[in-house]
Amino acid sequence: GEIFDHHYVEFKYPSGAVIHSQCRHQPGTVRNVNEVLVGTKGVVNLSGNGVVKINDHNGSLLHKYDPKNDLSPYQIEHNKLFKSIRSGGQIDDTEIGATATMTAIMGRMATYTGKLIEWDNAINSDDNLVPENISWNTKPPVLPDQNGKYKIPIPGK
């Protein structure tokens, strides 16, 4: 009852780059998780099934990546980690991890509030989504009605 069955967020960056991020997970529908990056020379489409396509602005296919014969990104990440450990090096993904997490938080804020969210708004927000007191007896903030149905969430409300 507390999550939307679909989301759409448009991320705009200072460089002028735009990312359209969308997902749908409604029962009985085509499920879709997709990011589309729009740049000055073309469009990158990152589908949830791992296929990446790059097209110019006229729609001509410039590149198609199919991951069938490649290692998973998780394995690549582990290979880099193990190599770093063996060589005595270190991997510091702190900044990219924090930025990616903040991007997700901002996307969630925009989707649920229906408002434009900018970095400063989000980083200075005092929104708290966690109940004050959590115990095994804490009631969820939203409960179903007498028919077991939840109120439908509406952006901005």
Predicted features by range, described:
Residues G1-K53, N58-K157:
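Contiguous beta-strand/loop segments that form the cofactor/metal-binding neighborhood of enzyme cores
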